[in-house]
Structure formats: structure tokens, C-alpha cells
């Protein structure tokens, strides 16, 4: 396959990630405003500042974003996300925004992460509904995701539903302590929930196989996906 043209913006995060990707793959770089040849394969970080529009027009793309595990530090305050460092892992996905977790990869990369796996919970008081950002609602064209998903979940369970997003005051880690299940569009927080013994369910077609909402009262955590996901994320040094 041809080397991708790396599309960068003026944002520091995008420029840093794109520069490192281009350096590692020996690829050419092009500013998002100057890119016109949509027959080319591209690579870029994030979906803001014109990158999503380019992604929609090309046939093949590599998408870069925060990883599945051991992500870089971030804070979420006043409706803004602040990246505290770039020491964590970043995912790279071909022709999608997130990996489906399928495959038969070994466990060597997963072991390097030193993750702590908790056994699947057998009890729980409520279901966490992880609300996607407005940006992701637009990307996936699901403007009424929260309302539609609440209705869907209520078809299969009468458990209490707690809506949570990255700006919620109560930390997700605290909520997971008494949660029965975690439901999201495609949030990587779903994998953190699984690490904490809370089964995750996704509405995105790419991830639906991990947990189907119709099975929310008889959940099973498939730990095999973690080996595969660990092979889809890298540090800047790598």
C-alpha cells in the first residue's frame, strides 16, 4: 500500500502527533488547507479543524487518537479538554476511528502495560450511560444518541441508568464501583470499565460484537480483545 500523506493542522496536538507519524513512516506532510488530491491515502490526528472533511472525501485513511489503555494525562474542566502530557499511548486505525478488537495477537504488548484486571462483577446497582461528545455525535450522525439509547436499554432491563460524560463531576472510576454495566457509542472508557470488571456494551457497529445491549442482563466480558487492542496503539517514541 502507498505511504499516506500526513494531514496536519495548526493545533499543537495535531502537529505533534502528525509530525511523529510522518517521521516514523517517512511520509510527506501537507497542511489541511492545502490538500486537494483525494485519491491519495492520508493519515491525521483527530476530527477537528478540517480533518474530518478530508477523511470523508478520501478512500483510505489512517486515524490517530488517544489509545485504549495507559493514555496520556488529560483534564476535563469548564467544557474543555486539556492534554497534560504526551507520555501515553495513541491508537492508529485504518479506515475507521476505533479498532474492532478482533484478531489473534499474542499478549506481549498487553503485558508491558502492567494493567490490573478485576474479575467480572456479579452484582451492580445501575447502568452507566456514557454520553458521547457533541463532536462524536456529529461524526457518527447520532444527534439523539442519549435519548435513543436510553429507550433501547430500557427494553432489556429495569435497572437505574446514570448518564455520565467526561465533564461529569463524579469520576467514572468511582461510579464503576457499583455499576452493573457500561453503555457507550464507542468510548474507550468502555475498555477501562471492562478492566474494572464491569461489562461494556457499544452501539457503534464496529464494537457491537463486544457487547450487545439485548444481552445486558446476562453480560460476559471477552478478555481476548485486550491482546488485539494492545497491538493497535503506540507511544510517540515507538
Task: Please annotate each region the language model reported.
Residues 1-53, 135-136:
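N-terminal pre-catalytic "stem/leader" segment of glycosyltransferase-like enzymes
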Residues 9, 64-68, 125-136, 204-205:
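Short loop/turn segments at strand-loop or loop-helix junctions that form parts
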Residues 30-36, 54, 151, 159-210:
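Donor nucleotide-activated moiety binding/catalytic core segment of transferases
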Residues 40-41, 126, 180-181:
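Structural motif
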Residues 48-80, 147, 195-209:
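A short, gly/pro- and small-residue-rich
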Residues 122-167:
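Conserved catalytic-core segment of nucleotide-activated headgroup transferases in glycan assembly
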